[in-house]
Design a protein with these regions (language model features):
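Short acidic, hydrophobic short linear motifs in intrinsically disordered regions
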Residues: 23-33
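Short helix-capping/hinge SLiMs at alpha-helix to coil transitions
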Residues: 18-21
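Localized chelating/binding microdomains
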Residues: 14
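Short amphipathic alpha-helical interaction segments
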Residues: 35-47
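Glycine-centered, phosphate/nucleic-acid-interacting loop/turn motifs that mediate DNA/RNA or nucleotide
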Residues: 52
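A generic secondary-structure micro-motif detector
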Residues: 4, 34-35
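Short, cationic-aromatic polyanion-contact patches
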Residues: 4-11, 56-68
Length: 68
């Protein structure tokens, strides 16, 4: 599979996890999606953020993400 496909697939996993779980920490998203590489997860965040679908919040040094 090419990289763009992988990012798109992972973006779908992230969207589904956040749709079910609401606002989650990055650690919780990683666990829920089973995306192994952190870079792949952040690429998926970028995909969704570019589409205007994610909000980010820094809470006491920990990054949280949610669907908008």
């Amino acid at each position: 599979r090419n990289m763009i496909e992988l990012i798109g697939t992972n973006a779908g996993l992230v969207w589904n996890a956040l749709n079910e779980g609401g606002k989650m920490s990055v650690k919780a998203v990683k666990k829920a999606t089973k995306i192994k590489a952190e870079k792949d997860m952040y690429a998926a965040f970028g995909w969704l953020a570019k589409e205007g679908k994610l909000a980010f919040e820094n809470v006491e040094g920990e990054l949280y993400v949610a669907l908008v």
